[in-house]
């Protein structure tokens, strides 16, 4: 499918962008909350993984059913109930990548008219397949901004914890 090829490529690229941002973080860094009042990086990764499964389900249902109902999922309830800090970041990113690869294959196999198929979202109303794919792309990119900010805050915190004593010796502050 030529029409949606660029959209599918952008959709596929998201998982690798996330992987690059989190792959070198320690468990402690993933679970830290360097930005007051915000989720940890681990919570963001788990939220993205859970959301990815929902986005894929919605896309599949729009392709397979006539005007299916697409339910809203409350991210705060998912975060509270689904053990985000007990999960594994590498596994969660792999789930996102796997789901996106599967969906990309499905999307590439569709006719051009499939992009206009619709579902009825419980809060957002009518949504086309194209809008659902774009939402999945935008959602991940939106959260990458927060992951970058958390990384920056962690780096700044680490820099502030390094001090030099009077003899020129570097010491680490806790």
Predicted segment positions?
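N-terminal beta1-alpha1-beta2 submodule of the flavodoxin-like/Rossmannoid cofactor-binding fold
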Residues: 28
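Terminal targeting/low-complexity segments that flank the catalytic cores of oxidoreductases
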Residues: 1-11, 172
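Acidic/histidine-rich alpha-helical segments that form the ligand environment
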Residues: 10-14, 19-21, 77-117, 136
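Short, contiguous alpha-helical
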Residues: 31-75, 104, 116-174
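A short, mixed-charge helix-start or loop-turn motif at secondary-structure junctions
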Residues: 1-4, 82-89, 125-129
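A broad, low-specificity signal for short, low-complexity segments enriched in glycine/proline
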Residues: 4-8, 65, 104-106
